């Protein structure tokens, strides 16, 4: 059986570029454990240029091949691609649209599901339509006096708020606000990251995460894991990835009643199926002191860095990551 030429595409144009490279390391190591794949790692930079790990400039053409700037190098045909890109253009659905156009099979959620989940406003509309509880919010489409007034009213009503750029990941463009004098500046900053902004009520709760993925034709939801931060610490980009971070994770959250855990998993599967996700996701919830469950967000290409929860939860559930990738890829190619 001939090997599969697999393009591992990483990087991208968002603030999560470097995190995507770390995740790609995990994918590359996992794929190397199988003899089925010829893997070519290509970095997409912030200017849309492609370069191999060896430093060769190249491009992905509509003939489903990698063509090198050095014309003495033969083109490399691509059978399958893993778009290991957090943020734009990976989780936004943009690059998936291009893969669809050139009929190149790819790993992960399709373009519409990616776009719907990445935009926090669209996602919350879907959560509500599916009957899944989520945090109270308002959304804003421009930075003006009315937006400032609405946000200040929300702060007065809720006591504490989060202001979030609607289309960013990893807590980029996300701010906790307790002081009305900071509202205008925070809104201005958030609108610098995205044309739409969402304002959410601050929820004092545990942060639980579920890995949801397809395995041998079934949608699997793991037991919830937990992100544990210092008291009153917001899980910022730096808290997630900085060496000085004091946050820690439990692959299986402790002291969660069985019925609550099962309800969280049921909501996670309902969101996965209802929003037509594919292959993998990480679905994040809040659990309040009163055991109220609130869906926070869906990540359609969860991180796979050394500290990331998705691969840990998958493995804790009894599944090998390399075998999981092989099953997905071979199943998809066989169905062509």
UniProtKB/Swiss-Prot annotation:
InterPro entries linked:
ATP-grasp, ATP_grasp_subdomain_1, D-Ala_lig_Van_CS, D_ala_D_ala, Dala_Dala_lig_C, Dala_Dala_lig_N, PreATP-grasp_dom_sf
- Predominant localisation class: cytoplasm
Instruction: Enumerate the spans annotated as ATP-grasp domain.
Output: 124-330
Can you name a GO cellular component term? cytosol
List required co-factors: Mg(2+); Mn(2+)
Q: Residues that bind ATP, according to the entry? A: 154-209
How the cofactor is bound: the record states: Binds 2 magnesium or manganese ions per subunit.
Q: For binding Mg(2+) 2, which residues are annotated in this chain's numbering?
A: 297, 299
The main enzyme category here is ligase
Under Gene3D superfamilies, the record lists:
3.40.50.20, ATP-grasp fold, A domain (3.30.1490.20), ATP-grasp fold, B domain (3.30.470.20)
Pathway(s) annotated for this protein in UniProt? Cell wall biogenesis; peptidoglycan biosynthesis
Q: Does the keyword DNA-binding apply?
A: no
Localization of this protein:
Cytoplasm
Q: Which UniProt keywords apply?
A: ATP-binding, Cell shape, Cell wall biogenesis/degradation, Cytoplasm, Ligase, Magnesium, Manganese, Metal-binding, Nucleotide-binding, Peptidoglycan synthesis
The answer on whether this UniProt entry bears the keyword Zinc reads no
Q: Which domain of life is it from?
A: Bacteria
So what does this thing catalyse? Answer: 2 D-alanine + ATP = D-alanyl-D-alanine + ADP + phosphate + H(+)
- The EC number on file is 6.3.2.4
Function, as annotated, reads: Cell wall formation.
User: Which protein family is it in?
Assistant: Belongs to the D-alanine--D-alanine ligase family.
What this protein is called in its record is: D-alanine--D-alanine ligase
Q: Which gene encodes it?
A: ddl
